Amino acid sequence: MSNVEILAPAGSLDGLYASFQMGADAVYVGTSRFGARAFAKNPSVDELKEALVYAHMHDKKIYLTVNTLLSDRELENDLFPLIAPLYEAGLDACIVQDVGVLSFLHENFPQMDLHASTQMTILSGDEAELYRNYGVTRFVPARECTIEEIRAMRAQTDLEIEVFVHGALCYCYSGQCLMSEEIGDRSGNRGMCAQPCRLPFTSAYGNGHLFSTKDMCTLVHIPELVDAGIDSFKIEGRMKKKEYSAYLSSLYRHYVDVYESEGKETFQALVQNKESRLWKDIRRSKDIYNRGGFCAGYLFETDKKNIMYPKKNGHFGTCVGTVLKASKGQAVFRVKVALHYQDILEFRLEDDTKAYEYTVKNEAAPGDVVTCNVKRGSTIFKGQKVYRTKNAALLSWIDEKIETIDDKISLKGKMTAKIGKPIALKLQGLSHEVTVFGEPLQRAVNRPVTKDEIEKRIRKMGNTNYRLTDFSITLEEDSFVPMGEIAKLKREALAAFEREAVSGRSVGEQKPHKKKELLVWQNASILKVSTMEQLRTAVETDENDVWIELPLALFAKEEDEVIKLLQNRPVILSFPRIMKAGAEEKWRTLINRLFVGAVVINSHRALLVAKKRFKDCPWIAAETFYHENERAKEVLAEFGICQAIKRGYGRKEVMVTKGCLKRTLDRCDGKRERILVSGGKGDKFYVVNNCDFCYNTIYTKNGEKKPEFDKPAWHHFTWETADEMRKVLKTWNLL
């Protein structure tokens, strides 16, 4: 049996069962609340309890998504009654983003596995190890990680590693995106992402769906993924139809099995032969869903531009033909693949926008010339590409396969019957076994019972979900048992087998929240500066009232002037939000010359660096190192981190991205730049590239300026001039 789990999305109950039937070993699914896909057709708690019985009898698993940020009220009042019945029904794990939720679940449901969500932005094995003591047994690295980084994680930890191998890619690091909340007041961290990144934007360098990524497909890379030591291959797509998750589950299960059973040489032969079943299956999976074709994701793509497709959003389909002739009301095109009744085609303009949609009336073979009527006024021209966005025959085939799969549970049976002793019947399935006992076996008065008679009665499963594939019996000679007793024993054994599929775990009352001491930054307001001009302005403030946050990546090249300006004034160090192990060594000399008064914890890597190098000064959580509830703040305190102080002035960072806008638009020159992008509804953002670490930060166009004088505030300056900065400082009585 394979050690690699195929983990499928289940956006509905139908999708859950379909994925299991087509080869998924586990599914991840939300329920009524707290999942990252609030608008999926999530099953109810009762439906999930039934699904858990089905899953466990088929040796499958169900993971519940609780991967959003919760308020104190939700955490203390609503989460326990949601999870408790599923825990008792044997829920296999919860996928979690909020560290407060992590702490709560580990305390109240200690026997349940917890998986750290990709929303936690974990970039290494030692970062994941931070949460082992909170019950984490598995983590999902950020989708921006490369296969080399995944291999390194495997060497760093024995925690299970779950990696996205197929489906949509977010432009922003998961969990770090605030764009949906900013544009439409629908927070991705609350499960309501509206995907505004898929909308068209304009910029001075180019227009289009500037932040829209292709979908990922890694079928050809299965050998590298398996050899990297990944435990679970995760397919994205809880908002997609059941046919999507079911079909992709079958493909990834099949090709993992091919590699594991037949080896690398056989698999590479499939990859090299473009007419192999592997490539045909990849083309079919494009028919199911793709955006701009497929890419290999950040796991394998070396050029980030290959990950983007700015010309079109939504299902791209597959190119099926080219227009040969266009006339008023008609289009003539040659097809290169088979077309089926009820396929949906799109005639597209050169910019990939839809010119006309056509539903196929008659089947056509590759090479056939098809004539179709089109609406007058539609832009149809010779050489125009025709795409299929719905493959009706493929969808029907998947549905038929789901319907006809025999998912009865195979059992092995063994009966032991000795005169004077209770008859024992043992049933063994994939995941568990049971033994039940009946009445004592009698000595025969007339005709003895035969093994064949007993086996015939045991094998009759009727309308149950079981089949008996193997049966053995030890029967003492000259014995007798009524067939009714055999039937009763079989019913009791099947009932016991089904009961055993439920965990048998029990949970008492919710444990009261014993509040712990929190760490709070109380020293002063904080000014985060980004330019030397701003640093010169910041030192005009009173160091008793104001501390300066110094982003090391922005000031390393000005080391001598920085030291001269600060003159032993204590500073707060901050590292890039996305930072790999060892990167801090780039700034070692600057760090050693500074009077480090505190460190900003804006990532797990920053926490690990602080634990190693800055044990004797306070650590302050950035607002993006989420701690929305009291329990999350307590977890930070256990790490030694002060909770963030409230934001004052500053542009909001709505995205931090591995993708680079300048690279997408062929403007990559290695120079830091600020690019204004505008959305269709007047939304404006600035994109700023960080070439040293090759990522972008996207900011709101304007800063927040409302003064709050009752407490210290954290002010973020980006590219303000000295005069603009002084004006803000005076408004806040800091100058």
Regions found by a protein language model. Give the residues of each.
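Active-site pocket-lining/capping segments in soluble small-molecule metabolic enzymes
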Residues: 1-122, 140-234, 239-735
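As written
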Residues: 135-136
